[in-house]
C-alpha cells in the first residue's frame, strides 16, 4: 500500500496533470504559470539548496509572506529536505512574530519584500543567531532602504532566485538523498506547525501530519465531488488553514489551478487588484470567509443604490423573491410560491443579478465558505443572485474541514454534513452523547485530527481524549444530519475574518488595574470590533462618584470606559495586546456572575456560553446602528438602579 503522504499527492499530480497549470502569480509580463510537474521539479531543486544551507531532518522552516507561487514551492521544498513548514499569518504584528519563530526552533525564515520590515524591526528578539533569512523577491531599492533604516546588513539576506541556481548546481549531489527522505517519510510525520489563537505570549503550535492533509483533502474532494482542472483565485492567505488544505493540497488531488492575488506593493495594492484578478483568473469557485462576502454585499448594495430608486426597487424585490423561491436550499417551497415570485425574480435576474455574477469572472459557479460562522442572510443573498455559498465548518486542529454544504446536499443556516471518514458526536459537559437536535460540544474523530500541540502535552491531553478531538464549539445535528454550529464553549474571541484570540489575559489586565470593574467577559463572535460585559464593585463606584464629584450617569459611564483602559498605562502591558481585541464598547450588567445564577462554575470560572445566551440582547445592542448611543442609554438605566449620585 502506498504511503498516504503529501509526497504521494504531488507525485501523482505531477504525472496525471503534468503540464496543466497549478500555480499562477502575476508579474510585469502578465501571469507566470507553473505546472504540476514544474512545481515538483522546482521544489526538489530548492530542497537541495536548503540542504546546502544546513537544513536537517525535522528542522523547521518559518514562512511569512503573501501568497505566491514561491510560497508553495518553499513549503514543498522544506518537506522534501526532511523539514517541517511553519506558516505564519501575515496579519501578525511585528512583536508577535518572534515568539512563533523562537518557539518552533526555526532554522530558516522565508519572507517577502512586504514582510521584511516586520521581521528586521525586531531582529534582536530572535533567539537563533544563525537564523537564515530567505527573500521571495528580487533585490530592490525598497529592500535596501528598509535594511538601512533598521541597521540590518543586506548581505545577510538570501534571495530565492540564487537558491534555485544553487539547487540546480547541487541537484545531482543531493538527488539520492532527497529520494531517500521521501521514501522514508511516515504518514504520522509532521508537515506543518500552525500557530493559532492564544495571547501574545502563549499561542499554540498545531502539528498537522502527512496523513492529516492526505485524508482531509481526499475526504473534501469525495464529499464535494469537485470537478477536475477547475480554477480559483486564492483570495485568502496561504497560511490560513482553510486555504492551506482546500487550496494547496486539494488542488493536487483534482488538478485545480490556483491564481494568487497580485500583492506587489503591499496589502493596499492587493485589495485594489482583486477585482481585475477575479476577471483574469476566470475562477469557477472562490474560497471565502464571512468578512469578504459581507464586504462584497455592501459594495453591491452601494452600487445599486447609486443607480437610483427604480433599479434599487427591482433589486430588492428580486432578492426577496429569490429568497422565497430557494427556501432553505434543502427543501424548496411549492408551485404556488414559485409562480407568485417568478416575475420579480426574472426581471432582477435579467437586469441585475447576471451582471453582479460577472464581477467574479465569467465562469463563477459557487463560493466555499469557511473560517467563521456565516450569517444565514448572507447565504440567502448569494443564493438569490446565483452564486451560492456552500458553508463549511472546521478548525485548524482538524486540518481543518469537519463538515460542508455541497451543491448536492445543501441547507442554509447549517454547516453542512460531516465529511466521509470523520465521526462526529455532540456531548454534554460530562462527555455523554446527546440526542439529535440537542445542543452540546462538537466532538470528532478521524485521520484529520492533529497530532497535538507542539511542546504542549498538557493542552494536547485536554483537547484530544481517547482519540476524540474536543472542538470547544457548541452545536447540534439536526433531523437531516446537518451540523448546526451555534457558538463557542471555549474562551476564544473570533473576529469577522475568523482570526482567533484568547481573552483571559486582557480580562485579567483590566480587572487588576480597575477598582470599579469587578468582572468582565470580553466578546467577539465574528464581529468587526470587540465588546465586553462588565459587573461593578458598587462600593468602589460610589467612592469614585464622591472623589471625582461625578454629577451625571453619562459622566460615570465615561469614567468606567476610562477605567477599562487603565491597564494600557502600565509598562508591562504597553503594546502587549493587539488593538482589535481590546473592547471598544461595553455593557454594565446589574447582577454579578455567580454560582447561584450558574454563570460561574464550581472552579469559579465564567461559563461564557451561558453568559452570552443570557445577555445576548445586550451584546447585540453594541453591534446595532448608533450602537454607542443605544449602549449608553442602556448602561445609564442599569447605573441608575445600582448607585445614587446624591
For every predicted segment, state its role:
Residues 418, 422, 432-437, 443-495:
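Conserved ATP-binding/catalytic segment of the ANL
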Residues 9-34, 588-593:
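AMP-dependent adenylate-forming
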Residues 53, 80-166:
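Structural core segment of the AMP-binding/adenylate-forming
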Residues 157, 493, 518-523, 528, ...:
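Conserved C-terminal "lid"/linker of ANL adenylate-forming enzymes
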Residues 18-21, 157-195, 202, 225-231:
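Conserved pre-ATP/AMP-binding loop-to-beta segment of ANL
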Residues 214-231, 238-353, 363:
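Conserved AMP-binding/adenylation subdomain of ANL enzymes
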Residues 33-36, 191-217:
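Conserved AMP-binding A3 loop
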Residues 23-68, 72, 76, 93-98, ...:
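Conserved AMP-binding/adenylate-forming core of the ANL superfamily
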Amino acid at each position: 500500500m502506498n504511503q498516504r503522504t503529501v509526497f504521494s499527492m504531488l507525485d501523482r499530480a505531477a504525472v496525471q496533470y503534468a503540464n496543466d497549470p497549478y500555480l499562477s502569480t502575476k508579474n510585469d509580463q502578465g501571469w507566470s504559470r507553473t505546472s504540476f510537474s514544474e512545481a515538483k521539479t522546482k521544489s526538489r531543486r530548492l530542497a537541495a539548496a536548503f540542504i546546502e544551507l544546513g537544513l536537517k531532518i525535522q528542522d523547521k522552516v518559518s514562512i511569512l509572506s503573501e501568497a505566491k507561487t514561491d510560497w508553495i514551492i518553499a513549503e514543498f521544498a522544506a518537506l522534501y529536505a526532511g523539514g517541517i513548514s511553519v506558516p505564519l499569518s501575515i496579519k501578525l504584528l511585528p512583536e508577535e512574530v518572534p515568539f512563533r519563530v523562537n518557539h518552533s526552533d526555526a532554522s530558516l525564515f522565508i519572507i517577502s519584500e512586504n514582510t521584511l520590515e516586520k521581521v528586521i524591526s525586531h531582529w534582536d528578539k530572535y533567539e537563533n543567531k544563525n537564523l537564515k533569512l530567505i527573500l521571495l523577491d528580487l533585490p530592490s531599492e525598497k529592500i535596501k532602504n528598509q535594511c538601512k533604516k533598521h541597521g540590518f546588513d543586506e548581505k545577510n539576506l538570501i534571495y530565492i532566485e540564487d537558491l534555485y541556481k544553487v539547487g540546480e548546481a547541487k541537484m545531482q549531489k543531493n538527488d539520492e538523498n532527497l529520494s531517500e527522505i521521501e521514501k522514508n517519510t511516515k504518514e504520522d510525520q509532521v508537515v506543518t506547525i500552525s500557530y493559532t489563537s492564544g495571547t501574545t505570549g502563549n499561542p499554540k503550535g498545531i502539528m498537522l501530519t502527512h496523513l492529516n492533509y492526505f485524508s482531509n483533502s481526499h475526504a473534501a474532494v469525495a464529499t464535494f465531488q469537485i470537478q477536475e482542472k477547475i480554477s480559483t483565485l486564492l483570495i485568502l492567505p496561504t497560511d490560513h488553514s482553510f486555504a492551506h488544505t482546500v487550496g494547496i493540497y486539494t488542488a493536487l488531488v483534482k488538478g485545480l489551478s490556483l491564481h494568487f492575488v497580485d500583492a506587489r506593493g503591499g496589502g493596499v495594492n492587493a485589495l485594489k487588484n482583486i477585482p481585475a484578478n477575479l476577471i483574469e483568473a476566470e475562477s469557477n469557485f472562490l474560497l471565502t470567509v464571512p468578512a469578504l462576502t459581507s464586504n462584497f454585499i455592501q459594495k453591491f448594495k452601494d452600487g445599486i443604490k447609486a443607480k437610483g430608486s427604480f433599479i434599487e426597487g427591482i433589486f430588492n424585490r428580486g432578492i426577496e423573491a429569490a429568497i422565497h423561491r430557494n427556501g432553505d436550499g434543502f427543501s424548496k417551497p411549492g408551485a404556488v410560491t414559485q409562480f407568485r415570485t417568478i416575475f420579480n425574480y426574472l426581471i432582477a435576474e435579467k437586469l441585475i443579478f447576471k451582471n453582479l455574477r460577472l464581477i467574479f469572472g465569467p465562469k463563477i459557479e459557487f463560493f466555499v465558505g469557511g473560517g467563521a460562522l456565516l450569517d444565514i442572510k448572507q447565504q440567502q443573498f448569494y443564493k438569490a443572485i446565483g452564486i451560492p455559498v456552500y458553508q463549511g465548518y472546521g478548525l485548524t486542529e482538524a486540518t481543518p474541514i469537519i463538515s460542508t454544504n455541497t451543491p448536492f446536499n445543501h441547507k442554509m443556516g447549517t454547516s453542512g454534513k460531516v465529511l466521509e471518514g470523520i465521526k462526529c458526536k455532540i456531548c454534554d459537559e460530562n462527555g455523554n452523547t446527546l440526542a439529535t437536535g440537542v445542543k452540546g460540544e462538537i466532538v470528532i474523530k478521524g485521520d484529520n485530527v492533529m497530532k497535538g500541540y507542539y511542546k504542549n502535552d498538557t493542552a494536547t491531553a485536554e483537547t484530544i481524549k481517547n482519540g476524540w478531538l474536543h472542538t470547544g464549539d457548541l452545536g447540534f445535528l439536526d433531523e437531516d444530519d446537518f451540523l448546526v454550529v451555534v457558538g463557542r464553549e471555549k474562551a476564544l474571541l473570533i473576529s469577522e475574518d475568523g482570526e482567533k484570540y484568547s481573552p483571559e489575559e486582557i480580562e485579567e489586565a483590566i480587572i487588576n488595574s480597575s477598582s470599579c470593574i469587578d468582572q468582565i467577559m470580553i466578546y467577539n463572535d465574528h464581529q468587526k470590533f470587540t465588546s465586553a460585559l462588565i459587573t461593578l464593585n458598587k462600593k468602589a463606584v460610589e467612592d469614585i462618584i464622591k472623589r471625582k464629584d461625578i454629577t451625571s450617569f453619562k459622566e460615570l459611564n465615561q469614567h468606567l470606559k476610562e477605567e477599562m483602559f487603565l491597564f494600557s498605562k502600565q509598562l508591562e502591558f504597553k503594546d502587549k495586546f493587539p488593538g482589535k481585541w481590546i473592547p471598544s464598547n461595553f455593557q454594565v450588567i446589574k447582577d454579578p456572575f455567580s454560582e447561584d445564577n450558574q454563570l460561574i462554575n464550581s472552579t469559579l470560572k465564567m461559563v461564557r456560553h451561558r453568559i452570552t445566551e443570557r445577555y445576548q440582547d445586550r451584546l447585540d445592542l453594541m453591534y446595532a446602528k448608533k450602537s454607542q448611543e443605544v449602549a449608553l442609554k442602556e448602561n445609564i438605566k442599569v447605573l441608575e438602579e445600582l448607585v445614587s449620585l446624591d
